[in-house]
Curated annotation (Swiss-Prot):
Lineage: Eukaryota, Metazoa, Chordata, Craniata, Vertebrata
InterPro entries: VANGL
Protein name: Vang-like protein 2
Localization per record: Cell membrane
Biased composition (Basic residues): 15-33
Low complexity composition bias: residue spans: 69-81
Predominant localisation class: membrane
Source species: Mus musculus (Mouse)
Length: 521
């Protein structure tokens, strides 16, 4: 008996060690595959500014009521530390994405600010240096020269406001590569300012120019040149992209939701940022629970046949003929999975309509109760109930119907009890109708409508065969990937339309109506 107990304990330990070794080997193979796959893709990363690198979906520690959630994690007596394959995938992805903070965005902003400050102070320095260095030798500034001071002041003010409005805006995303057009404009401004400084140093500072009016006109010319550069920046950065040149088709890889957009001349990385802006308010929220087929269809097993020849060698031909007949009969059998799927979908739609009707009735009764209380308070004034207390008071009457409806439509992960209470409080505060309250739950809304912890991805990966700084071309396809799904973007150029004119003589539509005495009009 002791021997048996020792043997059973040893077998349990060895089995546990073997399972742990298999778990470590499987984890190592998964990490190596994920690294190899990440090396094989030609991808760059677009990250939202000022946000951590870890995805919101990696934090699943939200506390909920026991009756409010559908799933429960059970820890058995033999599993002290449990982890799923999805957790391993998420951890590996987060470890690969947790890189040091990229300072390229701050470096670009700092370089632009320094260049703008240099460009703004250069005309002022041109005007102040001659009076400070050789005031006695300067010729007096006349009326025309003094009028140029006003011109310089207002032009610099316009340039300052225009530069602030165009360049110093809060960035929407951290681009993986340099914005080529903006970099070219910065280089152009730098060369312009350096050229003016070289000319000013050689022809004015060294020669000690006595005509102060000429110095002022030189400063005015620099301000005019900077204004023209600013106008060029407006054309290249803002106006050039307004004319539609390409049609983009954006498809979500998991459920096939698609949208079409028209864009102008933009680089691939700027188009990617623009598509993400459109995605959050045009696409319905991504719900992975809606992608699964009914359990009855998935659990259906296709029956198969195995034919064995148990006779002698003489009966080989007979057994072969019988096996062929059996296999042919099995092939002719029709699979009824589509019928089961059809009836499952019909039953689901019936259940949704039933839950929806109960929810609508419950909400109508709750709002009717609120109106009745408001009328009674007007007749008999007493302690007034604030919207939060009113929402908590009527939520109990609709909570069960709401919970069943959200569970049936698989929207429960996107609507917590607190969010429903806040929305109900908002509707009561603004005297909204029951239909306005139910609008959020009866149909899937845009992604941005829901709480950020449910949908916002801090990091997207742009996968493209072309350099992301290149402009759009006909036939270009690129991907915007995140952990759960990806957006596939295909590009088509807007076709060229040729119109012809056909002139219609207005006289060709005229006719003469001759009336006779017998004609009745």
């Amino acid at each position: 008996m002791d021997t048996e107990s020792q043997y059973s304990g040893y077998s349990y330990k060895s089995g546990h060690s073997r399972s742990s070794r298999k778990h470590r080997d499987r984890r190592d193979r998964h990490r190596s595959k994920s690294r190899d796959g990440s090396r094989g893709d030609k991808s760059v990363t677009i990250q939202a500014p000022g946000e951590p690198l870890l995805d919101n979906e990696s934090t699943r520690g939200d506390e909920r009521d026991d009756n409010w959630g559908e799933t429960t994690t059970v820890v058995t007596g033999t599993s002290e530390h449990s982890i799923s394959h999805d957790d391993l995938t998420r951890i590996a992805k987060d470890m690969e994405d947790s890189v040091p903070l990229d300072c390229s965005r701050h470096l670009g902003v700092a370089a632009g600010a320094i260049l703008a400050l240099l460009s703004f102070l250069t005309p002022l320095a041109f005007l102040l240096l001659p009076p400070l260095l050789w005031r006695e030798e300067l010729e007096p500034c006349g009326t025309a020269c003094e009028g140029l001071f006003i011109s310089v002041a207002f032009k610099l003010l316009i340039l300052l406001l225009g530069s602030w409005a165009l360049f110093f805006r809060r960035p929407k995303a951290s681009l993986p590569r340099v914005f080529v057009l903006r970099a070219l404009l910065m280089v152009l401004v730098f060369l312009l300012v350096i050229s003016y400084w070289l000319f000013y140093g050689v022809r004015i500072l060294d020669a000690r120019e006595r005509s102060y009016q000429g110095v002022v006109q030189f400063a005015v010319s620099l301000v005019d040149a900077l204004l023209f550069v600013h106008y060029l920046a407006v054309v290249l950065l803002e106006l050039r992209q307004l004319q539609p040149q390409f049609t983009l088709k954006v498809v979500r890889s998991t459920d096939g939701a698609s949208r079409f957009y028209n864009v102008g001349h933009l680089s691939i990385q700027r188009v990617a940022v623009w598509i993400l802006e459109k995605y959050y308010h045009d696409f319905p929220v991504y719900n992975p629970a809606l992608l699964n087929l009914p359990k009855s269809v998935l659990a259906k097993k296709v029956s198969g046949f195995k034919v064995y020849s148990l006779g002698e060698e003489n009966s080989t031909n007979n057994s072969t003929g019988q096996s062929r007949a059996v296999i042919a009969a099995a092939a002719r059998r029709r699979d009824n999975s589509h019928n089961e799927y059809y009836y499952e979908e019909a039953e689901h739609e019936r259940r949704v309509r039933k839950r929806r009707a109960r929810l609508v009735v419950a909400v109508e009764e709750a709002f009717t109760h609120i109106k009745r209380l408001q009328e009674e308070e007007q007749k008999n004034p007493r302690e007034v109930m604030d919207p939060r207390e009113a929402a908590q008071a009527i939520f109990a009457s609709m909570a069960r119907a709401m919970q069943k409806y959200l569970r049936t439509t698989k929207q429960q992960p996107y609507h917590t009890m607190e969010s429903i209470l806040q929305h109900l409080e908002f509707c009561i505060t603004h005297d909204m109708t029951p239909k306005a309250f139910l609008e959020r739950y009866l149909a899937a809304g845009p992604t941005i409508q829901y709480h950020k912890e449910r949908w916002l991805a801090k990091q997207w990966t742009l996968v493209s065969e072309e350099p992301v700084t290149n402009g759009l071309k006909d036939g270009i396809v690129f991907l915007l990937k995140r952990q759960d799904f990806s957006l596939v973007v295909s590009t088509k150029k807007v076709p060229f339309f040729k119109l012809s004119e056909e002139f219609v003589d207005p006289k060709s539509h005229k006719f003469v109506m001759r009336l006779q005495s017998e004609t009745s009009v």
